[in-house]
Amino acid sequence: MVSPKKKPQDFGFKSGDTHIVVNDITEKATAWSFDGKKLWEVNCLARGQGLDTEWKYPNTDTPPGLYKIGQIYNDYAKVGANPPYDRTLMAFGWISFDLVELENQEAKVGRAGIMMHGGGSANGWPGAWAPCQPLCTTHGCVRMYNQDLRDKVLPLTKQGTVFVSVYQEG
């Protein structure tokens, strides 16, 4: 397993902050509070279009390493539960979170734009907008259920910094 080289503590991890651990082998994301309390565990994928052990090329798995949540795009708040067809909404789902690399893990392999989002064009419309849409591979992002992004991840961003560690097959 390939793991992050750094920890949230290297970037000022403090009370109110959260650490989400994404394990692509188990297909789970687990959130931990600053004091080590397990907050929740949900299904997720950190898979791209390539081999299970490949993340160094465009459209392959999420590069392993430590990230933090940056910009938030809350399309669900803008358009509600029953929007008309839209390609962007279909691809990214209810809410998208930019993941800011903290280990140069994207740039060193010529990648950029890794996110955590829902949706899934392979699910069609309105399937990609469903609360618990099937999790399909991405072009390298972390995909979660739309409702988990809204009900579990989004509230954490209001409390403090959310760090995300991605573990990949090696």
Question: Which residues does each PLM region occupy?
Answer:
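Extracellular/luminal recognition modules and glycoprotein regions
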Residues: 1-12, 162
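Exported/periplasmic cell-wall-interacting domains
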Residues: 76-170
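Gly/Pro-biased beta-strand-loop elements
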Residues: 7-115, 119
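Intrinsically disordered/low-complexity terminal segments and short unstructured peptides
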Residues: 2, 17, 29, 126-127, ...
